[in-house]
Curated annotation (Swiss-Prot):
This is Uncharacterized protein C4orf17. Residues 245-259 have a biased composition (Low complexity). Residues 286-299 have a biased composition (Basic and acidic residues). It comes from the Eukaryota. Residues 151-161 have a biased composition (Polar residues). Residues 90-117, 132-161, 235-359 are annotated as: Disordered. Coiled coil: none annotated. It comes from Homo sapiens (Human).
Amino acid sequence: MNLNPPTSALQIEGKGSHIMARNVSCFLVRHTPHPRRVCHIKGLNNIPICTVNDDENAFGTLWGVGQSNYLEKNRIPFANCSYPSSTAVQESPVRGMSPAPNGAKVPPRPHSEPSRKIKECFKTSSENPLVIKKEEIKAKRPPSPPKACSTPGSCSSGMTSTKNDVKANTICIPNYLDQEIKILAKLCSILHTDSLAEVLQWLLHATSKEKEWVSALIHSELAEINLLTHHRRNTSMEPAAETGKPPTVKSPPTVKLPPNFTAKSKVLTRDTEGDQPTRVSSQGSEENKEVPKEAEHKPPLLIRRNNMKIPVAEYFSKPNSPPRPNTQESGSAKPVSARSIQEYNLCPQRACYPSTHRR
């Protein structure tokens, strides 16, 4: 085989080199191969084809590194590279200048069917799946770990910036250790001590009320709540809550008297006045007349004493009971009124007892 290429082959090679020089941005320019690696093969229509026997591994690594670096810099996919539309590229000699027989590592030709389909389907680079996949991978990448810093100031600033970003993007969980330290510091300031032994002794020997008050004070200071006003409100509401009744109940019982009490007192006085003359009229001595006078003075005292007892007991026991006439003859009287009537009945008998004994 003749190793000296004819003039036509030299012209074709000159055209190909000119095309390669114009399209440096997309094609990878190789160095001039060794003469032992170059050979010419008779192609179609008796046109010689220049081929170069390259190592697949070496060229593959060279092509992969160079093309990937270039695409990462310009961020354009393979399908959008500006390939030449000249007729010289379509010629068979230029096709023969394809470097390696393995076509999987070579970018697609501009006028081949795969490249046409890609161009028809994706008119812009944003619609290209290669670009979208690359952006998705970048978004899914975890943040790089913080590198070792030479100066402490830059390292601290980087750490604070990352901490702020993490706090902004995550839910804040309270740090219980910080709260315990703050509570312990407040407790030491209240007890006026710095030793943990004294704090433990106070916790062991303090009463429950003291512990509750100190804990409420510490938590209120931490929460910035005015505990004194809240405590005053609670103390003012405690007596009303204990009794379960409005504070007007604590007023003297003579303020709120039932309406039927005046009628009861009048009935009692009338009954006593009606009974006393019948008992006194049977006695003719003057001494016996003086004793009923004392008895006449005693029933009003008993009634006055009952004035203080009856309304309060009736108010607490049966506040909503309907008024009923309270007489000696009515058997359905209240127990408190019945007791007062019995006491009244006993008093005149005691007052008249000496006169009957004399008789």
